């Protein structure tokens, strides 16, 4: 378990964040644990929210947690598809991803992921890209909707 002194905690924690005592409780219970954080793509296209998100992930990392970020990219994907003249089809709120669409989705998500990783590295937060195209970690079955 990572030992962090109170003086160090006060330097790491944002001034508007939780109290040191509250953080210490979580550190004792969850230090060196993986934390999976899902962040929607619409949050990350706002530069101010993106910067706050990066700062929060960096803070978690400095506290000894191991954050894993799972991100979306809906707005960027829609914008890129529109730019390329590819019409999006949705069924019950889910995007139908044909071959042409999935290639754009993969490209946009990989670029977005690289931006997140680069921003984290600039904050001295150890991070790396993991995605299905490069790391071959996801297999998919076609779902037929009624």
Regions found by a protein language model. Give the residues of each.
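Nucleotide/pyrophosphate-binding catalytic subdomain
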Residues: 1-146
């Amino acid at each position: 378990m990572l030992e962090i002194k109170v003086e160090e905690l006060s330097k790491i924690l944002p001034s508007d964040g939780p109290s040191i005592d509250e953080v210490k409780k979580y550190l004792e219970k969850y230090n060196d644990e993986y934390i999976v954080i899902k962040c929607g793509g619409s949050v990350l296209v706002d530069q101010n929210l993106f910067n706050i998100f990066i700062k929060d992930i960096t803070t978690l990392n400095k506290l000894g947690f191991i954050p894993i970020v799972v991100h979306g990219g809906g707005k960027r994907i829609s914008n890129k598809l529109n730019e390329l003249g590819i019409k999006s089809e949705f069924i019950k709120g889910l995007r139908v991803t044909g071959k042409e669409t999935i290639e754009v989705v993969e490209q946009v998500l990989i670029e977005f992921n690289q931006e997140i990783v680069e921003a984290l590295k600039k904050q001295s937060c150890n991070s790396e890209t993991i995605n299905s195209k490069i790391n071959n970690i996801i297999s998919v079955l076609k779902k037929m909707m009624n």
